[in-house]
Amino acid sequence: MLDFNIKDENIKKGIQNINNIARLQEITAGNLKNLVKNNLFLISGDHNEDGARVLNDYLQSLDCNKHIIVGMMANKDHESYIKCIKNISSITTVDIPNQPNAISGKELKDKFKHLPNVKYAESVEKAIKSIKLNRGDLLIITGSLYLCSEVLNLN
């Protein structure tokens, strides 16, 4: 076995500096953040039932109105995913650009039609502009790492 002689203190510092992109990542600046203004703006590439449960646990720990923009790949279990997300003020489905294996935002909206306050927007930017955010509200974009990548590129 190799002995790298790494001190515990260095391991702790390394762990504290891990940056997990698109996993409850806060967007603090940029073009899309400017649309969200002073509200908390997150992206999280959760795309399955387990990820949705963890996301929901986090969202339920927050005392604010929560707005979700969601786009997903066609091969995911959309119904199981959205069943895990509770107490959401609005859900806006979107298309994921340049992803032929994504479900269209319109189809996703149809799958979520049993939920209140579900709408469709053609793009992330249009979705953000369509949501009435009050002071202190949260906006999270989720459902696919591809969608989160698009957000980072647009921002």
Residue spans for each PLM region:
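Active-site-proximal loop/hinge segments that shape catalytic or ion-binding/gating pockets
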Residues: S144
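C-terminal helical cap/extension that packs against the catalytic core
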Residues: N38-F41, I82-L138
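Short, active-site-adjacent cap segments at secondary-structure transitions
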Residues: L147-S149
